[in-house]
From Swiss-Prot:
Belongs to the Lgt family. InterPro entries: Lgt. This is Phosphatidylglycerol--prolipoprotein diacylglyceryl transferase. Pfam families: LGT.
Length: 281
């Protein structure tokens, strides 16, 4: 017995030609949470520089991660399409964001603040890191409401979900596995892993508490950032085994996804940062 995707409207309300969507709303509440939690952390840790500059820092990182996320998606996932459809780069309502691109954008912004205010970049990233998982989780809820980024076909998994808008991809699966035709006829779509919810739990909830409890004690500079890179990379690589690869890319060499390739350097960088934080004098 499979689970049917609930009837969720991705649009909150519409006024004239303008529609407010849940996905965009998730970005808003993520930023508001980051602003609130960031100020709370700055007061608790008595980081005077952060108290004075936190709003500018967070606004800049939010903007940098959004721009980086868009550019990252274009370069990493669909460069051939956007190189021939340049105006589509600005059609952000059509979707297309990359966490890894957003991370690069955030790092560029933090590097600027590090240079301007004579702070170590890892001091800044250690402050920012606990604010990230909430946004990751909220974003995946937005993906779920949009019924996008669903997982791979899993007919033997009892809690697989039927996503009605996966039919185009399902037809490609039928060509490879004709035995799935009966399931398609019966349910209207093939059962898939609800990987948005997996990511919500691992990258949103679990990662938040890992970073939260780790950062409650005084830690060496860089260790919080390193821990985040390691666990996000591990969680993302794990989930990619269940997530449907982007159709325009598929499995690279029929083995690995682009998300896994981009996450592996995060783990390596996290391990190096952790080692230097604790052992390099």
């Amino acid at each position: 017995m499979y689970i049917f995707f609930p009837k969720l409207n991705p649009i909150i309300f519409t006024i004239g030609p303008v529609s407010a969507r849940w996905y965009g709303f998730m970005y808003v509440i993520s930023f508001l949470f980051a602003m609130w939690y960031g100020k709370k952390c700055s007061i608790k840790n008595k980081k005077i520089w952060y108290e004075k500059k936190i709003e500018t820092l967070l606004y800049s990182i939010f903007l940098g991660s959004c721009i980086g996320g868009r550019i990252g998606y274009i370069i990493f996932y669909n460069f051939s399409y956007y190189s021939q459809n340049m105006l589509s780069v600005f059609y952000i309502w059509e979707g297309g964001m990359s966490f890894h691109g957003g991370l690069i954008g955030a790092i560029i912004v933090m590097s600027y603040f590090s240079f301007k205010y004579k702070k170590k970049i890892l001091e800044i990233s250690d402050f920012i890191t606990p604010l990230i998982p909430f946004g990751l989780g909220a974003g995946r809820i937005g993906n779920f409401i949009n019924s996008e980024l669903w997982g791979r076909v899993s007919p033997n998994f009892s809690y697989a979900m039927i996503f009605p808008n996966s039919q185009n991809q399902d037809l490609k699966e039928i060509k490879k596995y004709p035995e799935l035709q009966l399931l398609l006829d019966q349910y209207g779509a093939l059962p898939r892993h609800p990987t948005q919810l997996y990511e919500f739990f691992l990258e949103g909830i679990l990662l938040f508490f890992i970073i939260y409890f780790f950062s409650k004690k005084d830690r060496p500079t860089g260790s919080i950032s390193g821990l985040f890179l390691i666990f996000y990379g591990l969680f993302r690589i794990f989930i990619e085994f269940f997530r449907e690869p982007d159709p325009q890319i598929g499995l690279l060499k029929n083995i690995i996804t682009m998300g896994q390739i981009l996450s592996l350097p995060m783990i390596i960088a996290g391990l190096i940062i952790m080692y230097k934080s604790y052992y390099k004098k």
